[in-house]
Curated annotation (Swiss-Prot):
Taxonomic source organism: Mycobacterium avium
Residues annotated as domain sHSP: 21-131
Chain's role: Not known. This protein is one of the major immune reactive proteins in mycobacteria.
Pfam families linked to this entry: HSP20 (PF00011)
Protein name: 18 kDa antigen 1
InterPro entries given in the database record: A-crystallin/Hsp20_dom, HSP20-like_chaperone, Small_HSP
Protein family according to the UniProt entry: Belongs to the small heat shock protein (HSP20) family.
Amino acid sequence: MLMRSDPFRELDRLTNQVLGTPTRPAVMPMDAWRVGRRLVVEFDLPGIDAESLDIDIERNVLTVRAERPALDPNREMLATERPRGVFSRELVLGDNLDTDKIEASYRDGVLSLHIPVDEKARPRKIAVGAARHPEPSPKTAREVVNA
């Protein structure tokens, strides 16, 4: 059996107990990928109530906020490893994404955002027409030659 060892975990735990603050910042892990004509972004937010999620877009900056409330201070905690408080993450979106059509869903602790590529930014073919010169009529050709 393999075990992952973190020599600082015990130090972090003791520091948190003594000072009452986490030594590492709360994170909002995410994955992002492109599927066809849309960008998919997923954030891991286990234990977050969907009502506490707040998603804003201003210009091309997408902000995701969530909150995991503090525990009852009267509890005698034996372990506190899950970060609490407000989490926030900002993503700068490219101009090629249609921010008016973002879809969001939250299921099993995962927030999923689907952001379509803007129609104007999609690759498209531009037809090139050949410039055609009118063929001279026999009369016109004789006039040109005689000139």
